[in-house]
Amino acid sequence: MGQTLIADIGGSNSRFALAGAAGWPERVLVTENAMVADLETAVARYLQETGARPRAATFAIAGPVLGEEIALTNCAWRFRRAELANRFGFSRLQIVNDFEAIAWALPQLTAAHIRPLGPGALPQEGVKLVLGPGTGLGVAALLPVGRRGYAIASEGGHILFGAHGTDERGVFDRLHEECGTVSAEKVLSGPGLPRLARALHPERGYREPEAVIAGAHRGEAAAQAVTRLFVRLLGRFAGDMALAFKALGGVYIAGSIVCGLGPLLDEAQFRAAFEGHPPHESLLQAVPTFLITSDQPGLIGCAALAQMNELAQAQT
């Protein structure tokens, strides 16, 4: 058995590591995607800096994993599976969706990696759902199958999204003017936060999510109104997805955007929007919600997958 290279390839940043024997990532390095030409260059740089010579690789990709050629949704990178494996001598190359990898990580996470998001019952036996805004909006689920469960990817972040109530109609009208068809990802993502800010306060001209969050932390009323609406919409979307998957095992929110909100993440408002889905309020009241505080759940999931692959290979 040789080393396995693992990677969480996001729209803005990529994390590389080696899968440790205990099923956890080791020797983690982070690459800013804009600073390298393509995935092959990023992989080569990691291998050069660490001196690692992995025989296998498990990558999580922020985009749909279909066919031989794979393209990231919010990054210009694209690659072909066989060419990548041949260039680096991988005897096995496994590619999964980035949020599918996080779903695989859920059984590994402890109290050091998550915290409750609002009150809620204990998780029941059933589907666990993970979602979160980053460069895009990811959604995946872990089905209660076998000892570890079975993760499935989705493209739920691209469902159409709209106003609920008169106070949101003008906002969504302006969102439609700016970006045409409004999907959940157009609003609930890093690029979506300033987009939402421009729709709510067009005179402010917000361009970066960091500017909105920093303004809200400073007490700027306009920015705080944006983050309040963002939290409400995130709670509503999470409730939508929890109903779609009947996620009695709990809903887990990932991503640096939500973690960066800190005290701006009004848990009562989030839960109210999450539960406000008649006639199934009581069902959602029984579904606990959690915030993933670890900054590398995708790598943890890839390491778990690599360990599963090694165990399966040892048994053959």
Where are these regions (language model features)?
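Short, glycine/charged-enriched secondary-structure capping and boundary segments
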Residues: 20-21, 72-75, 109-111, 144-147, ...
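Fold-independent oxyanion-binding glycine-rich loops
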Residues: 9, 61-62, 98-99, 133-135
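Conserved phosphate-binding catalytic cores of ATP/NTP-utilizing and phosphoryl-transfer enzymes
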Residues: 1, 44, 92-128
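Short, acidic Gly/Pro/Ser/Thr-rich loop/turn segments
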Residues: 14, 64-66, 136-140, 195, ...
